[in-house]
């Protein structure tokens, strides 16, 4: 299917088959499609509404074209979310990666610079002193040595360069805003994945089921966070061995007090890192609590905790005893040694 035909179909409201979407995505990712065609197609697709089949096909093409990170670990975990919730809160998903690694998970943390908040995973890790420009073998070595590696998206998804211009110029969310967490270059089958809109909670879980993931928690909070919130209830779609279950969780069920989002907001990567370090030093406040509840879910997703309750309790202890802080420091050293 050529780009003009695909644009015609989606603007008429017709869903593409997986085979058709695969052809279109290959043209976008290999530079065959023009910027105008890319923009027109993405907008048409958004107005129609992306289907699970279309998202699955697009993710498969991106995975195929990515620079792979090969690690001999069947239970790799990723905590990458979509970003884009405009909350300007500390980078919870990054903090969770180190708590989960301290709890025995092997973590391939996929991430990038900021989408719409003050800082993304890459910004925070750079502020901590980590090198971001590692190649696939160096990332794999960090995972082997310290249990966590950072997969900086531009290093692994070079084919994305063809879509960057149109996406930036359009300035609206498109299919690509949800593809990042679906295209981990290490193929992590376990995930805690926050999405920027509740509309995506179940479709993303269904997409990951089609892609072969094992245990995933897709989350969106009522207060808008693409994390499990301590300021509101959170909607969860749990994928576990092919079955998807929806439920809601609250901070109270884990014995945590509610907090205002303003208690978690930061203006720079350095401020985000400072809040993370406070939590990693065992200082119990809103930052500690939101990291604990999300890291607990990550431990459960990685099958390192039998229940969410056990995961949250375990994550809190890893924060209190300094294990998460030591893991962060070991990771930063590893990025500078490999």
UniProtKB/Swiss-Prot annotation:
Query: Recorded GO terms, molecular function?
Result: anthranilate phosphoribosyltransferase activity; magnesium ion binding
Q: In which pathway does it act?
A: Amino-acid biosynthesis; L-tryptophan biosynthesis; L-tryptophan from chorismate: step 2/5
Q: Which residues bind anthranilate 2?
A: 167
Give the GO cellular component terms, alphabetically: cytosol
Cofactor annotation: Mg(2+)
Give binding positions for Mg(2+) 1: 93, 227
Oligomeric and partner information: Homodimer.
Q: What is this protein called?
A: Anthranilate phosphoribosyltransferase
Q: Which organism is it from?
A: Alkalilimnicola ehrlichii (strain ATCC BAA-1101 / DSM 17681 / MLHE-1)
């Amino acid at each position: 299917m050529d780009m003009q035909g695909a644009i015609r179909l989606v603007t008429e409201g017709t869903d593409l088959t997986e085979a058709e979407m695969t052809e279109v995505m290959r043209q976008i990712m290999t530079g065959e499609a023009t910027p105008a065609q890319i923009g027109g197609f993405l907008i048409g697709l958004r107005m129609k509404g992306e289907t699970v089949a279309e998202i699955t096909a697009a993710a498969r093409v991106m995975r195929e074209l990515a620079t792979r990170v090969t690690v001999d670990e069947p239970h790799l975990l990723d905590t990458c979310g979509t970003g884009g919730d405009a909350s300007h809160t500390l980078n919870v998903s990054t903090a969770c990666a180190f708590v989960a690694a301290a709890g025995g998970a092997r973590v391939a943390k996929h991430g990038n610079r900021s989408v719409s908040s003050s800082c993304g995973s890459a910004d925070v890790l750079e502020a901590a002193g980590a090198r971001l420009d590692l190649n696939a073998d160096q990332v794999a070595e960090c995972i082997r040595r310290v249990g966590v590696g950072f997969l900086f998206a531009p290093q692994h998804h070079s084919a994305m360069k063809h879509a960057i211009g149109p996406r930036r110029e359009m300035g609206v969310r498109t299919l690509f805003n949800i593809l990042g967490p679906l295209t981990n270059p290490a193929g992590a089958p376990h995930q805690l994945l926050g999405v920027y809109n509740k509309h995506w909670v179940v479709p993303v879980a269904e997409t990951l089921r089609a892609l072969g993931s094992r245990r995933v928690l897709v989350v969106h909070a009522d207060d808008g966070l693409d994390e499990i919130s301590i300021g509101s209830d959170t909607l969860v779609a749990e994928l576990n061995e092919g079955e998807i279950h929806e439920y809601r969780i609250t901070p109270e069920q884990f014995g945590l007090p509610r907090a205002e989002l303003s208690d978690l907001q930061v203006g720079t990567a350095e401020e985000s890192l400072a809040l993370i370090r406070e939590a990693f030093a065992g200082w119990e406040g809103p930052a500690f609590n939101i990291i604990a509840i999300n890291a607990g879910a990550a431990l459960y997703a990685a099958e390192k905790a039998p229940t969410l309750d056990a995961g949250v309790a375990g994550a809190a202890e890893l924060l209190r005893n300094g294990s998460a802080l030591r893991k962060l420091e070991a990771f930063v050293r590893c990025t500078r040694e490999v």
